[in-house]
């Protein structure tokens, strides 16, 4: 696989809402054979209020949704401790970062909060603000 494009909650929300920039990035990634992914927890965090359930289901059928396993939460907990961050605020980002760190390279994360994810993901992951 030629890499991974990971969506945080804002990236996924923008995909649900047909944001042109995010749709274009996801389409380009898919055309190049890049795996588009997110975490199961991110799907809960993403904005559902104005999105038809059928659209959410359709989008998620085309995205690799990673289960948040004990192994991932263990790695996320290490990231939180390492960076002195509290799980109450950063748990979902830490889980996504744990997934990003093990995903096929190169890895890009689309996020609205690049500072937190840049810290958690480390230098091998490109973090892009959307």
Predicted segments, located by residue:
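A general structural signal for well-ordered alpha-helical segments in protein cores
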Residues: 22-23, 43, 53-56, 73-76, ...
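Short, well-structured N-terminal submotif of metal-dependent ribonuclease cores
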Residues: 1-38, 48-61
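Active-site neighborhoods of divalent-metal-dependent phosphate/nucleic-acid chemistry enzymes
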Residues: 65-114
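Acidic, PIN/NYN-like endoribonuclease modules and their adjacent C-terminal/linker elements
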Residues: 2-4, 25, 101-130
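Histidine- and aromatic-rich ligand-binding microenvironments
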Residues: 7-8, 38-39, 89-90, 125-130
